[in-house]
């Protein structure tokens, strides 16, 4: 059975944010969540909902496959 790695997701969320040159505060505002929620995600303490995951993909211009670790290739736009 597949076991999901919340910490890896958090690392990818942080990596994508940094690649876009965004502070945590800027990213939280762009995604529409509180700074504490973004911190929880990046630390692997919580996982985003499917809707929030899509917002992250659009804000950071990455694919859900990449964020979730399904595909490790270069980042792609969500939905492509």
PLM regions: where:
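A short, Lys/Arg-rich alpha-helix, primarily the initiator
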Residues: 1-19
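Short, charged recognition helix plus adjacent turn
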Residues: 1-2, 58, 68-80
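Residue-level detection of the helix-turn-helix DNA-binding "recognition helix"
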Residues: 18, 32, 43-45, 72
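Alpha-helical residues within the helix-turn-helix
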Residues: 18, 29, 58
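Short alpha-helical DNA-recognition segment
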Residues: 21-40
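DNA major-groove recognition helix of helix-turn-helix/homeodomain DNA-binding modules
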Residues: 51-66
């Amino acid at each position: 059975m597949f076991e999901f790695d919340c910490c890896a997701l958090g690392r990818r969320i942080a990596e994508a944010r940094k690649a876009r040159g965004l502070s945590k505060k800027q990213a939280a505002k762009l995604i529409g969540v509180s700074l504490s929620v973004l911190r929880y995600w990046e630390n692997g303490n919580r996982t985003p909902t499917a809707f929030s995951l899509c917002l992250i993909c659009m804000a950071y211009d990455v694919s859900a496959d990449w964020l979730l670790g399904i595909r490790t290739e270069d980042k792609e736009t969500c939905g492509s």
